[in-house]
Design a protein with these regions (language model features):
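Tandem CBS (Bateman) regulatory domains
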Residues: 1-13, 52-82, 88-97, 118-151
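A positional/architectural concept
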Residues: 2-48
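The conserved cystathionine-beta-synthase
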Residues: 17-35, 82-100, 107
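Residue-level signal for alpha-helical context at structural boundaries
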Residues: 22-25, 45, 74-75, 110, ...
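A glycine-centered beta-loop-beta connector
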Residues: 31-34, 39-55, 96, 104-121
Length: 151
């Protein structure tokens, strides 16, 4: 089983954030600079919300608002679902699917230690499945030699 801590160990735990007083434009700059789809909104070091590309599309563009004049605090998602380091990938997948979200902040001892995206979950799931396929092929063929590549 793959756990959140395993994913963060591989990808790093650097979570990008902005303050609630940041403009939407500033949040978009951070997302573009780091090639990410969402930023955490931290107020005095505490998680206050999440602002995503989806929020921008639906709450700025479609409503004709100006990104340089709109504060993140006006549009961010406040009821944020989070996971912990000991949660497994299936828990992340279930939350993301049921809540129709793409990013999960990771908390440990009350503080933010990272973010898991739907891309991270898919990548890890594929990797885990490839490993399982290789092991099953070795078992079925009785092969103890070089690993057989999974397609």
């Amino acid at each position: 089983m793959v756990y959140v801590r395993d994913i963060l160990r591989k990808k790093g735990s650097d979570a990008r954030s902005v303050s609630p007083q940041a403009t939407v434009f500033e949040a978009l700059e951070v997302m573009a600079e780091h090639n990410i789809g969402a930023v955490l909104v931290l107020e005095e070091g505490k998680l206050a919300g999440v602002f995503s590309e989806r929020d921008y599309a639906r709450k700025v563009i479609l409503q004709g608002r100006a990104s340089k004049d709109t504060l993140v605090s006006e549009l961010m998602e406040r009821g944020v679902f989070c996971v912990g380091l000991s949660d497994d990938i299936n828990t992340c997948m279930a939350i993301m699917t049921l809540q129709r979200i793409r990013h999960l902040p990771v908390l440990d001892e009350g503080g933010v230690v990272g973010v898991i995206s739907i891309g991270d979950v898919v990548k890890e799931t594929i990797s885990d499945q490839k490993f399982t396929i290789r092991e099953l092929k070795k078992y079925i063929t009785g092969s103890h030699g070089p690993e057989i590549e999974a397609d």
